[in-house]
Amino acid sequence: MSTDDEFWKYNNDMIVRCLAGVSRNDRPLFLKAAYNGPAATEEISSYDPANLVFGILGGSAGTTRDCLELLKQAEKYGARVALFGRKIYQSECSISMITAMRRVLEEDISSIEGVKAFHDDLSKLGIKPKRVLKDDLELTEEILQVNL
């Protein structure tokens, strides 16, 4: 068992144990946590889907591909909410970033296609991207690379 494998199992176990000690009336409706990969997300999102919505945290800004791939993988494995504050407000254009995120989910395009569309949108708005397209297409988050 790898360290990462041990961590997500421990983390999910602690979340469930904490929730077990809370009465149904006081239990949260929404749970947010870091994305720890497919198995971790599937397990925690299926804990009590009728009463608890699972969402992921965005973490650091990273590349646009990191953002869109995280969103794609998290949704695929059960997350239903994404709290991506920094990934949105630190992007070149918040509206264009949200548009790219919606395209990836609603139009079922790949994170690569989403990054290209995001750069096209920035170009149309006359906004210079922080990274050239080649660099923004890089997937820098290890947890996301493993699950492609």
Task: Describe every region a protein language model picked out.
Residues 56-62, 77-94:
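Glycine-rich phosphate-binding active-site loops on the catalytic face of alpha/beta enzymes
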Residues 57, 62-64, 68-70, 119-120, ...:
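Mixed-charge, polar/low-complexity N-terminal
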Residues 75-77, 89-147:
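C-terminal helical cap(s) of enzyme catalytic domains, especially alpha/beta-barrels
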